[in-house]
Curated annotation (Swiss-Prot):
An example Gene Ontology CC term for this record: extracellular space
Protein family according to the UniProt entry: Belongs to the kappa-casein family.
The protein, known as: Kappa-casein
GO biological process entries: lactation; protein stabilization
Tissue: Mammary gland specific. Secreted in milk.
Function statement: Kappa-casein stabilizes micelle formation, preventing casein precipitation in milk.
Keyword Mitochondrion part of the UniProt annotation: no
Main localization category: secreted
Taxonomic placement: Eukaryota, Metazoa, Chordata, Craniata, Vertebrata
Classification via InterPro entries: Casein_kappa
Gene designation: CSN3
Length: 125
């Protein structure tokens, strides 16, 4: 089992008069000998059905304090050192310069295109 970071809460409705809501204290007015009126003059407006309560923040979340911007921080820059761009190697095709004499002569003779002359005779009437 791990550490439970959440508060244990009972499954009891909030408006139960015997279990008070843990984050709020109800105002208590003690009048021992004074007469407490039973009927109050209520306004003609319907009261809200649900009392909105702010959610309590979990206690395990650490909220950092706000920092003041009074001090201006100037970063220290070293002006003596120069920044050189990185050298990027370029990929160039490598040409093999070793030439065999026999192979080059055969290549030259076989690579020359042959030109042939064809006579075209047209028979038009």
């Amino acid at each position: 089992y791990g550490i439970n970071y959440y508060q244990h809460r009972l499954a009891v409705p909030i408006n139960n008069q015997f279990i008070p809501y843990p984050n709020y204290a109800k105002p208590v007015a003690i009048r021992l000998h004074a007469q407490i009126p039973q009927c109050q003059a209520l306004p003609n407006i319907d009261p809200p059905t649900v009392e909105r309560r702010p959610r309590p923040r979990p206690s395990f979340i650490a909220i950092p304090p706000k920092k003041t911007q009074d001090k201006t921080v100037i970063p220290a820059i070293n002006t003596v050192a120069t920044v050189e761009p990185p050298v990027i190697p370029t990929a160039e095709p490598v040409v093999n310069t070793v030439v065999i004499a026999e192979a080059s002569s055969e290549f030259i003779t076989t690579s020359t295109p042959e030109t042939t002359t064809v006579q075209i005779t047209s028979t038009e009437i």
